[in-house]
Amino acid sequence: MKINTYELWSGADKSSVTYTAYLVEETPDIKNHNPRPAAIICGGGGFFKITDREKEPVALYFLNKGFQAITLDYTVGKDSSYPTPLYDLAKMLLVTREKAQQWNIDPDKIILIGFSAGATHCASLANRWNESILQDYFNYPKEKIRPSLVILSYPLLDFSYQYDSVVADPDNQRPTKLSPMPKLDFLTGALKTVVGKELIRENLQEHSPIEHISADTVPTFIWGMQNDDCIYNNALLDYAKKLKDNAVLYELHMFAMGEHGLSVINQNTQTEFSDYKELAIWKKLCINFINQVLDLN
């Protein structure tokens, strides 16, 4: 296997945006004639950082399932308001398709896998790949930045719903399991980072993924937990309903118990093997969905 890290954009102002490609190569002992599907992985971190737990461990899992894997360190922090991360993901799709032959990738089978904040960005591209905000910026055929499908792990999909819910929550001063900050400060801070403007209705809706679902949204797999203490997950049900209303192929798995940030739920991601290891079934369900959509069987 070959592992290399590259800058996504040319220019010093974008040097922090990198990607790492994990590529299985053909050797005398490993025949790898057929192009592989590719998985572009976007970890989460509240829009402030990207956790290692949702990068290489995920890449290794999908490598073992027959994919070439790429982890993307998209823009985070003070410069990461929309549409900047959307541009990062679209650029990663372009680069992957440009290098498809070199990397032994099937350009028609490139998926996005996102976790938490990274899943928010993946959902945005799944919905907006053919919008003018991207077409005007890249001036490429729109199909070049269309993912084949997206996998959304405990995503934040409706900014207005999250804001309204945390403001109204009588328990919003308690910390979450992933942050010592009060939940109100944590969630509104994350929303301010990604929205980049005052948290009023118009601004929250402008780049909220749920507002951009259409009949052109790509097939979507979603999983989350009812008792997730970082976000309010009823929004996943609303999102799935809107996918259905637009005749978009989707699958939703809402587990009763679990924790935000579970990733692939194995010894590479848990300091103590999780109490929720039975939720690792999401990976099998996800692979089944991918196989059906991409006809990989």
Which ranges hold each PLM region?
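N-terminal cap/lid segment of alpha/beta-hydrolase-fold proteins
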Residues: 1-34, 201-203
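Short beta-strand element of the alpha/beta-hydrolase
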Residues: 35-44
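Catalytic nucleophile-loop/oxyanion-hole region of alpha/beta-hydrolase
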Residues: 50-52, 70-107, 272-279
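Short amphipathic alpha-helix adjacent to the substrate-entry channel of hydrolases
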Residues: 52-70
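Primarily recognizes the serine-hydrolase "nucleophile elbow" in alpha/beta-hydrolase
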Residues: 94-171
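Conserved strand-to-loop "acid loop" that flanks and positions the catalytic carboxylate
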Residues: 155, 221-229
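Mobile cap/lid helix-loop segments that gate and shape the active-site cleft of serine hydrolases
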Residues: 165-212
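C-terminal catalytic histidine-bearing segment of alpha/beta-hydrolase fold enzymes
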Residues: 221-223, 234-297
